[in-house]
Amino acid sequence: MKYSFIIPVYNRPDEARELLESLNRQTLRDFEVLVVEDGSQLPCRDVAETYAAKMPVRYFTKPNSGPGQTRNFGVERAEGDYVLILDSDAVLPEGYLAAVDAELQACPCDAFGGPDRAHASFTPMQKAINYAMTSFF
């Protein structure tokens, strides 16, 4: 397995559904998905189980501890060579993983990152803050 997507979730089953649907549309399929429920009152188990029939999805629950520990929980259980951590409100374009894979083959590295795409409704200030907080390292 080359890629492991870690998705920490807290009370966001609808967002998790949209993200899992975007992962299910990826053209490159060498990945697993770990959904880590962080003490949610609105669990997304049913959503995860629906997508587990379409792609490798593992679902975990744990007591609420915040995003950092929840990400680490997923990373500790990941089987991929690369770990990609996504917030539950992310939606990936269809060719995202294929583009990442092509770039990593052309220029191998141990870690990578980059900016999010700002939502169309963001003000210029929100776009600037979003870019500053998610820029390449």
Describe the function of each predicted region.
Residues 1-4, 24-35, 54-58:
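Short loop->beta transition adjacent to catalytic acidic/histidine clusters or analogous donor-positioning motifs
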Residues 95-127, 131:
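Conserved donor NDP-sugar-binding/catalytic core segment of glycosyltransferases
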Residues 12-15, 40, 67:
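Donor nucleotide-sugar binding loop of glycosyltransferases
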